[in-house]
Amino acid sequence: MDFILNISVKMEVIFKTDLRSSSQVVFHAGSLYTWFSIEIINSGRIVTTAIKTLLNTVKYDIVRSARVYAGQGYTEQQAQEEWNMILHVLFEEETESSASLESIHEKNDHEKNDHEIDECTSSFETLFEQEPSSTETPKNAKLYALAQKTVQHIEQYGKAPDFNKIIRAHNFIQTIHGTPLKEEEKEEVRLMVIKLLKKK
């Protein structure tokens, strides 16, 4: 319970102080993932679900607060998009309105999305749905190198179930070097990471 309260306090402070800046929000989302990922893995999915419920409660305050900054060029739509990014970075969440994520260093260049953000649904169960074929060869050396770096990053955390390794890999891909990949590139690297981890 202390763990949940700790997250609650930190999330509240971050969202209330940094909502206006896209780069800061995404940066702190990545920081939160780093701070809590080990404890989330050790505590199991029950704790993860509890945190998700907590964050969804906070979500509505974040979206409402965006109206305060509308005069500064910060819209409710941008708040919704950033919330999508935050959940994706923290818990490997997918939404219907997921757009390609941009560099966290670009504060005011947001891609518009005409769809409403739907309820975030966990993709935990589908992580292994699509696996690379045994004959697959890297078509993009840069992406393959990124996959190798991602695997090295995962191994630095010590032993963890393969299930969680993939989650960590996918989240790390989102924020590596502050430049999230395009959706098709992200999927390509994800498959490479799965293949590399299976060889371990």
Swiss-Prot record:
Does the record's keyword annotation contain Phosphoprotein? yes
Keyword terms of this UniProt record? Early protein, Host cytoplasm, Host nucleus, Host-virus interaction, Phosphoprotein, Virion
The induction text for this entry reads: Expressed in the early phase of the viral replicative cycle.
> Where, per UniProt, does this protein localize?
Host cytoplasm; Host nucleus; Virion
Tell me where it mainly resides. host cell
For this chain, the Swiss-Prot or TrEMBL PTM comment says: Phosphorylated on serine residues in the 115 N-terminal amino acids.
**Entry GO CC:** host cell cytoplasm; host cell nucleus; virion component
Report quaternary structure and partners: Oligomer. Interacts with host HNRNPK.
Purpose:
Modifies the subcellular distribution of heterogeneous nuclear ribonucleoprotein K (HNRNPK) and may contribute to modulate HNRNPK functions related to processing and export of mRNAs during ASFV infection. Necessary for virus internalization.
Entry's family note? Belongs to the asfivirus phosphoprotein p30 family.
Q: What is this protein called?
A: Phosphoprotein p30
